[in-house]
């Protein structure tokens, strides 16, 4: 089922191993009894306020613990030096591809329909903001009579990309 979701989102060349590497969480399987009764009665959360995109600080900090504290030019030099190691370079490319696949999934999945509202005839994307993705998922897994409480960034409430989420 999860692999089919990736294919539906336009990502067709993934193997089962590739899908497993993304560690998908299958809500219906994990909470079958909750789904059978209509969804969760209450959802409380503080979702991440990041975007689904490659982040060199996340990756290169594994090889240089001071990477996050370095200035921009020092980060560039350190990254260049680290990428001289073929294993690190291959891992960086793999990490970037993995993040691009995740972004493509969220952009193409029918499960996330509230992420690119139409404003004055133009589609406004949100760069796969995790807080907005989590909020849309909360709408899906909540029962009709449930309470949802989330700590969210202001862009959800005032940004153009949050329009469909607010109207939902």
Predicted regions, residues:
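SAM-dependent methyltransferase catalytic-core segment centered on the flexible catalytic loop
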Residues: 2-168
